[in-house]
Structure formats: structure tokens, C-alpha cells
Amino acid sequence: MPGDGGERCGSIGGMSTTGAREPGWVQDVIWWHVYPLGFVGAEREAGPDQAVVHRLGHVAGWLDHAVELGASGLALGPVFASGTHGYDTTDHLRVDPRLGDDADLDALIAACRERGLRVLLDGVFNHVGRGHPAFRAVLEHGPATPTASWFRLRWPDGADAWRPGTEPEYDDFEGHSALVALHHDEPAVADHVVEVMTSWLDRGVDGWRLDAAYAVPTSFWAGVADRVRARHPDAYLMGEVIHGDYAGFVAGAHVDAVTQYELWKAVWSSLNDGNFFELDAALTRHGGFLDSFVPYTFLGNHDVTRIASRLTDERHLAHALVVLLTTGGTPAIYAGDEHAFRGVKEDRAGGDDAVRPPFPATPRELSPLGLPTYSLHRELIGLRRRHRWLHTARTRTLHLANEQLVYEAVGDGGRLVVALSVGDRPAEVPAAGVRVVLAGNAEVADDRVRLPAHGWAVLEG
């Protein structure tokens, strides 16, 4: 893929660390995250003899949009054969026929390479769909089949009493019987995961998002990660972790990063409640994570309500984006958020559809109502790319009140000051050492910044 891979990092922000291991190229990545099955308008379920429909070219048609936005990487949701939503994988080595075939994915990877975009794939290795050949063999041939050890099975009346048609009980993923949990103590499972990951890295992708990584023992990930990096030392491995000991997981699993859900929640919750104390606490914890790894940061993804719908005041969408792009992390923009797409996730069958919509053939067909948000994304992404050190920047609070927050982002000799207000009246806040407004709307005088109602600004000396 484009550019020098560089060495794996051993320091963050000029400070020595013991856990930082990400590839050097990650410093410059801003992901544009796409959920392919929704993006291309694929059928909700794959048929038993699903014909190949060449739809991945639809994603390729939007790559110039990603580049113009300022993104430098494409983070793809599930692209492998599955029964429904992509997270019930039936073949990790074959593209979902609803999206196309392997040649289509190869072409998409090549199109990314031509534009200087890195590629991240979504790997579901905690569980498989019931239609996966390894589990299907168990149903057809019983406990003696070689892949029976891939799963935690409980046979009625015992394995010796098995008869054709007898189905075992099995561990699943969080109560979803369609998602059969893998047995991660089984060496053959690790061998399979390593084969899948290295096969696609061999074909030109740059890394993996590890779905439901929190549900898998860190010892399993550590063994897999070490074997994958033996062949692909510059591969980026990022695990989905919702809460808990982020730094401990990264160290134990030998991954580069995890999803930063704590910061995601604090951003929209603080803005909605007019309570910047919550965000301040989250930024303090975030700084602690940066001592050992660089989190994967985001405002939206395929699993959560769109940020434009989550916020109770649309004026605060800018504030949320400012925080994302002026704090340490590897940021991702969920496709559509840059045009203020709305969508509410619901806890029901099909409840994700609103946040995984089909996209038109080209960006020109989008509503012009989203253009101001698109322009803001371009402005702030451009600011971040001009200040590369923000990737590992630490924040320090300069002023804190319920409705106002001023913090400085510092790193590698650089310094920016961010001022935010969600109050209904203009606010004057301290901000020593700044003279220039880089983005936003503010007046600067005598080490103080005057913000309009619901205003924000990014400043420097």
C-alpha cells in the first residue's frame, strides 16, 4: 500500500512507552468507514444459491469523495460470505456474493492503492454463522467430525449416543443462536484465523478490525497477532472493545488499538446535558490510554445512532467533530456523518437499517442540506492533517464549567487551544498564549477568548 510502512512505534508524543506497537503509517490515517452491505443496497438475506452481484464497484465510485473529504484510509465493514448482516460469516476466504467476488474486492483494493488510501477489513473471529462449513459438518456428521473441536458442544445423551439429525447445544454470541461461538482454546481455530488474516494481507489490505474482540481471550489474540505479524509486521490490528480495561486488553492481546467508546459517549452526553465535566473526565482517562496505545476514535459507526440524531441540538455537531479531530487517536468518519445523515438504532430485528442505509450512485445525488457539515469536516480534517502530532496529542484543561470547556492539545512541540461553549449567551473564557483563530468563530484579546452563543474555536499562538 502507499507510502513507507515505517517501523512500529515505540514512543508516543516523544515519551517512551512499553505498550505502543502500532505501525508508523497509522499516524497519518483518517479512516472513512463504510458498511458495504448497506451501502450498496444488498438484499437483507443471502439466498441458498445466491448469485454473484457485482456491487463493490459502487463503493469504488465513492473513493474520490473520501479523498476529497481528507480521509487517507477506507475501513470496510464485513465483506465475506454470510447469511444476513455480514457478522454471521459462512466463508472468511470468499467475498459475499451479494457484494461480488474476489476479483471485485481485489479491484477495490487496487483502486484504494491508486488513491493513496489504506484498507482495513472487518474480521469476525469470535463466532461464525450456522451455515459455516465447519459447523455444518458438525450438524451432518456429528461429534466425530474433525471440526467438532472448533465449538463448545453439548450433545443430548452424550456424544456416543449421537444419531443423524441430532443437534447439539452450543455456546453462542450473547444469546444469538444464529451466531455460533468458536472454541478459542482449539489450535485449529487459531490456525484458521491466522490463515484468513494473512491471506487477505497478502492480497494488499493493511489491517484488521477484530469484531467482538472483547469476547475472545486475550491469550488467543496474542498468539494470532504474533503469528500474523511474523509475516506482516506492518499490519494494523484494532479490536472492538466497549468498556473495561482498554490498556490491559491492548497489552494482553498484542493488538495496536481498541475502539474508544468511553470518549464517544462522553462527547455526545456532555453536549446534550450541558455538562463538560463528563467530557473533561473522559479526556483525562483518554490521556492515560495514550501512554500505552493510540485509541481508535469515532463519533459514529454501523452499531450506534448517528451523531446528528444523537445530539439534541444540531449546532453542537461542530463541537463534537472538533473534539474528535483535536484529541489524540486514530479517527474514523462513518460514511454519511460528513453530510449529517440521520438515523436511530433500534433494539429490534432490522433495527440497524436506519444507520446502514444505501448510498446513491455518486455524491452529487446527495441532498445539498448536508453541504455545510461536509465543508466543516473538510476544514477540520485539513487542520488535523496539517498538525500530524495531534495523533498522539495530550490534552490539558485550561477552563472548565458546565457549559464551557477550554483545553490545550500538545505534542511534539505543537500546541493548539480549543474553546467550546454550549451556552445560550456569549461567553468569555481564559486562553493564555493564543492569538490566531484557525477555525471557528471567536474574538481574541488579552489572553481571553470571546465565543458567541453555542460557539467554538480552535486557536494557536
Model-derived features with residue positions:
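Loop/helix patches that line or flank the sugar-binding groove of alpha-linked glycan CAZymes
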Residues: E22-Q27, A42, A46-G47, A51, ...
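Tight coil/turn sites that cap or link beta-strands
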Residues: H176, A432, P452-W456
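C-terminal beta-strand-rich structural cap/linker in extracellular carbohydrate-active enzymes
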Residues: D446-G461
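Active-site-proximal helices and loops of the catalytic beta/alpha 8
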Residues: I109-R115, H132, R136-P143, E195-T198, ...
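Beta-strand-rich binding/interaction modules
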Residues: L416, R425-N441
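Acidic/aromatic-lined carbohydrate-recognition and catalytic surfaces
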Residues: S16-H184, A188-E195, D202, R209, ...
